[in-house]
Amino acid sequence: EGDSVAACMKNWGFELPADATEADAFNAIVAKYPSLAEAVDAEKPEGTTFTSLLNDYETKYTKGIETGTSAANISGIKKTGDYSMTVSLTQVDATAIYQLGVTIAPMHYYGEKTKYNYENNQFGFDKGDLSHVREKTTTPLGAGPYKFIKFENGTVNFEANDSYYLGAPKTKYVNFLQTQEDDKLNGVVTGTVDITDPTFSSTTVDAIKAANKNDDVNGPAITTDTVDNLGYGYIGMSANTMNVNNEPGSDASKAYRKAFATVLAAYRTVAIESYYGERASVINYPISNTSWAAPQAADPGYKVAFSVDAQGKDIYTSDMNDEQKYEAALQAALTFFEAAGCKVENGKVVSNPEGGMDTANYAIEREALIPADGKGDHPSFMILTEASKALEKIGVHLIVTDLSDSTQLWDTIEADQADMFAAAWSATPDPDMYQIYFSGMDGKAAGGSNYMYDINDAELNQLILDARNSLGQSYRKTLYKSCLDIIVDWAVEVPVYQRQNAIIFSTQRVNMNTVTPDITTFYGWLNEVEKIELN
């Protein structure tokens, strides 16, 4: 999760240093899949090349666009002035605007003025001829506040672009340093770094307070700005492996998963408070709190995740202490196991839904995978271990496997062999749920991450499409609440936490009056970097 290269690559099973670059990510991919690079770069002994293995390579893969009888222009794109245009769509799509974040380049750069005649559908180049574009590959053009000067000894040097459209930046030079995670905070303290983004752990907080000498994360040495991370942590279950009679969407299968989810959910608060302290909060729906579609406690129909039994009765009361809540969760789990078809006697599960035993010693035995570096270093590790101890009391064996290599997690999920797993999602500004929860219908393919949970619900699919086809935020929020209720009912995802990210500034060297005020999850200090001045 998160925005760093290392965090993003971890979601795909790659362990990289905290300061990994995009080049490091590419090299890691090539290292894992060397045959791909070898096929592209070299011929096989018998003389077969990678491209020769592609059917009709010359006709299908050597041209970027179709020429000849193709359209002379795109009717939905209209020039309205020298510096303005409109884009029209064939249908309403709330997510379309996020697909239009394209880089703007002047015609004199990508084309030739002599070949431009808008009225005659000439746009500065010969259609299908990319030679002029390729000439610019080694001479990039940008319009940002700073110009790239060089990369040397782990430092990227930038110089102010005096022609920047919002005005020349106040600070002439900006350097970006390759830095190890452990060196970020120390760099600000010692004066080698002015702005950075350390992992906002308890250790980091204590070190910031020590530097400020005032028991506060804001002070004479360091100023801290925190925002909610664009994403959330969860514990997932595969509907294809965690079900009854190979019917993932049946009531019995949902009850089976809810039995586990109810116990897991009970330990979220103690685990997250232990791991993050005040820097994270427990969430009750599988959506980041940064989203406008996230349900709020005051909203009608809001429920604490997995807080009712199989009969729909609330299992917690306001006067319960933690131990009483854990016991209530166990008793509720037994009602769900019974609803799934398990036999329960004397407060224990004595048979699985099929009437037998999963193993010689346990009626039910399942495994939860967690990439905690083999040492329990993960926000959800305590949840799983405490839930495992609790489930043991009712005759259910939950194996918690702590993976030192997270690649095993993603490989197991993709192979459809994982029961439960702890992970996190990176979110997007729009709450569209197609990618994760849409299982395919009416000729539309399933979302690319649907395999994570294997959820397949016709009503959910339709709600996702309906929400895409509206621009009304209130209406879409209502639809997404219905989507979230269905996802919770499937019990394929236990929402766990919303954590914070931190940006720290050297109070001594950065003029904080010039830094972007009211930094948010979606709008950070870099959006107004041209305004920043040093003291």
What are these regions (language model features)?
Residues 1-53, 57, 80, 86, ...:
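Aromatic- and charge-enriched surface segment that lines or borders ligand/interaction sites
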Residues 83-85, 184, 190-199, 387-390, ...:
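Alpha-to-beta junction loops
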Residues 85-86, 144-149, 156, 172-178, ...:
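Short, well-ordered beta-strand elements
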Residues 94, 262-305, 379-388, 411-535:
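Detector for C-terminal structural segments
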Residues 154-210:
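Ligand-site clamp/hinge motif
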Residues 157-159, 251-389, 531-533:
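Append "and occasionally in soluble cytosolic enzymes with long acidic Gly/Pro-rich linkers
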